[in-house]
Amino acid sequence: MAINRIAHGSLFLTVVLFFLTVNYGEAIWLTIPTTGGTKCVSEEIQSNVVVLADYYVVDEHNPENTPAVSSKVTSPYGNNLHHQENVTHGQFAFTTQEAGNYLACFWIDSSHHLANPITLGVDWKMGIAAKDWDSVAKKEKIEGVELQLRRLEGLVLSIRENLNYIKDREAEMREVSETTNSRVAWFSIMSLGVCVVVVGSQILYLKRYFHKKKLI
C-alpha cells in the first residue's frame, strides 16, 4: 500500500510538473526566407531570471550541406547579449539584469544563395526550466519524489515571483494611466479657460468698437 501511494504521488507530481513547466520551456520553429529576411522571437522576462536557448538549422532539401545563419540577442535597453555569424547551430545563456522584452533575431547572410527558405529550431528555456536538476540531485543526494517536490517548490516560487511582477507592472500602468488622465483633465481645463478668455476679449473689443462707431 505504501509503495502504491508513493507511485501515485510520484505520478501526480509528474503531471503537475508537466503542466507547470509548459510556460517555462518551449520549442519554436521559424522559417527564415532566403532573400535577406530576418525572423525574431521575443519574451517578456522579469529581472534575475536565467535564460538558456539552443538553436539549430534544419534543412530537409539539403541535409548534407546545411546552410548557416547569424543570430543576435538584445536586452530591453538594446544591450548586446549574444551575437554569432554563419553557424548551423548555437547556444546562448544569460541572467536578465532588467525586466522587459528580450529579443532574439536570426537571419541568413546575403552572400548565401539558397533556393528554398530554411527552418530554424529554437529551444528556449528560462527560470526553473533552465535549472540543471540532475546536478542538484547529485549534489544534494536526492531523488524520486523528493526531487520532484524540490522542483515543484521551485516552480511555485517562480510562479509567485511572476505574479508579483505582473502585479507591480499593473500598478505601474495604473499609475501612468492616472497621471495621464490627470494631465489630460488639467489640459482640458486650461484649454477651456483660454477659450473663455479669448471669447471675453473679443466681446470687449466688439463692444468698444460699436461704442466708438456709435452703433450702440
Curated annotation (Swiss-Prot):
- Offer one Pfam family short name for this entry: EMP24_GP25L
Topological region Cytoplasmic? 205-216
Localization (cell): Endoplasmic reticulum membrane
Question: Which segments does the entry list as coiled coil?
Answer: 137-159
UniProt short sequence motif COPI vesicle coat-binding, positions renumbered to this chain: 209-216
Glycan-linked positions = N86
Q: Which residues lie on this side of the membrane: Lumenal?
A: 28-183
Name a biological process GO annotation: protein transport
Give the record's membrane topology.
Single-pass type I membrane protein
Q: Which residue ranges does UniProt annotate as crossing the membrane?
A: 184-204
Q: Does the keyword Transmembrane helix apply?
A: yes
Superkingdom of origin organism? Eukaryota
Q: Where is the signal peptide?
A: 1-27
The family database entries (PROSITE patterns) matched by this protein are listed as:
GOLD (PS50866)
Q: Which UniProt keywords apply?
A: Coiled coil, Endoplasmic reticulum, ER-Golgi transport, Glycoprotein, Membrane, Methylation, Protein transport, Signal, Transmembrane, Transmembrane helix, Transport
Question: What is the documented function of this protein?
Answer: Involved in vesicular protein trafficking. Mainly functions in the early secretory pathway. Thought to act as cargo receptor at the lumenal side for incorporation of secretory cargo molecules into transport vesicles and to be involved in vesicle coat formation at the cytoplasmic side. Interacts with p24beta2 at endoplasmic reticulum export sites for endoplasmic reticulum exit and coupled transport to the Golgi apparatus. Once in the Golgi, interacts very efficiently with the COPI machinery for retrograde transport back to the endoplasmic reticulum.
Query: What domain notes does the record hold?
Result: The cytoplasmic C-terminal domain contains a functional dilysine-retrieval motif, which is involved in the retrograde Golgi-to-ER transport of the protein.
Spell out the subunit comment: Probably oligomerizes with other members of the EMP24/GP25L family. Associates with the COPI vesicle coat (coatomer). Associates with the COPII vesicle coat (coatomer). Interacts with p24beta2.
Protein name as annotated: Transmembrane emp24 domain-containing protein p24delta5
